[in-house]
Amino acid sequence: MSDLYAVIGNPVAHSKSPLIHAGFARQSGQDVRYEAILAPLDGFVETVAAFRQRGGKGANVTVPFKLEAHTLSSCLTERAKAAGAVNTLVFGADDILGDNTDGAGLVRDVAVNLGYALDDRRVLLMGAGGAARGVIRPLLEHEPAALVIANRTPQKADDLQRLFASSGNVLSAAYEDLRGQEFDLVINATSASLQGDLPPLPKGIFAGASLAYDMMYGKGLTSFLQFAQQQGAARLADGIGMLVEQAAESFFLWRGIRPETEPVIGMLRSSLGSP
């Protein structure tokens, strides 16, 4: 009988996680079944309990339940504590381990798949919500020269700066404060691209050999990546690699096997018609 896993969210029909984990299972010969579960907005805990009763071994958690998953977990990894949110649950006999693989997924995509070294780089992280918070500690572990957090509401960026100040050279800024500065890596951790919108970035922020990275993805270039291309960013990357890499980290937690991500990234790009 196949071991059962799932992604739990609301909405969840759009999730690529079942496709990704099916690819991992085929390649590694693991007998697993992975499904998408729509949880009521007020029924996440009950949905997890019902899934465990059905024999679920673990679950991915997507919006809007990552904070609830953090609260539900009986023990947390250090990176989940730093992120303040959980996207991966591992079910034990009497406990639930909560982890956050988003930051590891981003860093692995940038450093390994894209071959872009993070040490001594000036990094700009746009956004101060859960997506941004989840990647700060993993980015700082690679010792960038500076990590600047910019947000439309500067107070939120200030809060994150204080939270991670002891982990590296972290600064906070309003977007207008960025005028005249250049960055080697610019990461969009906002959801603006989903609406075809763009954070209010000043022109001239991309350094000569810069990488523009959008956590969002779609069939073509996102609005942020279009802006970056027009502004002379040397390289562009969307969030498909991060999506697959964070899933691979979850798969490793559950199965003890680290899958090959390159063929799954290629398969996902083909299915989306993404460049």
Curated annotation (Swiss-Prot):
One GO MF term attached to the UniProt entry: shikimate 3-dehydrogenase (NADP+) activity
What broad class of enzyme is this? oxidoreductase
According to UniProt, this protein's pathway is:
Metabolic intermediate biosynthesis; chorismate biosynthesis; chorismate from D-erythrose 4-phosphate and phosphoenolpyruvate: step 4/7
Gene3D superfamilies linked to this entry: Leucine Dehydrogenase, chain A, domain 1, NAD(P)-binding Rossmann-like Domain
> Active-site residues?
K66
Biological process terms from the Gene Ontology for this record are: amino acid biosynthetic process; aromatic amino acid family biosynthetic process; chorismate biosynthetic process; shikimate metabolic process
Q: Which cysteines are joined by disulfide bonds?
A: none
- The record lists shikimate as bound by S15, K16, S17, T62, N87, D102, Y217
Q: Cite the EC number.
A: 1.1.1.25
Gene Ontology cellular-component terms for this entry are:
cytosol
| Key words, A-Z | Amino-acid biosynthesis, Aromatic amino acid biosynthesis, NADP, Oxidoreductase
Q: Which reaction does it catalyse?
A: shikimate + NADP(+) = 3-dehydroshikimate + NADPH + H(+)
List the Pfam families hit by this protein, alphabetically: SDH_C, Shikimate_DH, Shikimate_dh_N
Q: How does it assemble?
A: Homodimer.
**Which HAMAP family does the UniProt record give?**
Shikimate_DH_AroE (MF_00222)
What job does this protein perform? Involved in the biosynthesis of the chorismate, which leads to the biosynthesis of aromatic amino acids. Catalyzes the reversible NADPH linked reduction of 3-dehydroshikimate (DHSA) to yield shikimate (SA).
Q: Which family does it belong to?
A: Belongs to the shikimate dehydrogenase family.
Q: Which NCBIfam families match?
A: aroE, PRK00258.1-2
Record's protein name = Shikimate dehydrogenase (NADP(+))
Organism, as annotated: Nitrosospira multiformis (strain ATCC 25196 / NCIMB 11849 / C 71)
